[in-house]
Amino acid sequence: MAYTLPELGYAYDALEPHFDAMTMEIHHSKHHQAYVNNANAALENLPELAQGCPGQLLTKLAEVPADKLTAIRNNVGGHLNHSLFWKSLKKGTTLQGALKDAIVRDFGSVEAFQAEFEKAAATRFGSGWAWLVLQENGKLAVVSTANQDSPVMGKAIAGCEGYPLLGLDVWEHAYYLKFQNRRPDYIKEFWHVVNWDFVAERFEKKVEHCNCTK
């Protein structure tokens, strides 16, 4: 089953003035499309691995042939991460309810959570992602991953683990047209476009046995 580029569900300029339309268009139609194309190419002769969603595949990278591992890790990871990212973006939503209560419980305050998340995003050397994850013990945590690694890959591969609720892409292609080298400014703008309704849904439903974006 070939992967396909998901539709955004909103216009490229829907997140203006925080995220610009040109970056969104290039990021989605060029960068994400490349991950989809390369993932499909890597899986072309591995139909047993191509079944199901990318999140399921990334939890069992140990089953991937060694000569395909890097390509699948990078490109299926990129497809999964971006698919989650697009759904995590929307103006005008509010952090509330059970998710807000859990954030206050585990970080002390919403402000403390945001500060920790911003630090993870700003200090990720080179390319990667910052994440809010739900751990197996039921607590929330902030982690970061390099390149297109995802927490669903597990600690041995990604250096962390957890069920991703919210991710921020800190590759330069995600922000450089608008923010140039000012990554901290990009991170600050992110809070204006987080789709807290989507994040809360992931927190409350925790899609069983799947780390995709259904």
UniProtKB/Swiss-Prot annotation:
NCBIfam families: PRK10925.1
Name of the protein in its database record: Superoxide dismutase [Mn]
Stored Pfam families: Sod_Fe_C, Sod_Fe_N
Gene Ontology cellular component annotations, sorted alphabetically: cytoplasm
Name of the gene encoding the protein in the UniProt record: sodA
Domain of life: Bacteria
Annotated positions binding Mn(2+): 27, 82, 169, 173
Top EC category: oxidoreductase
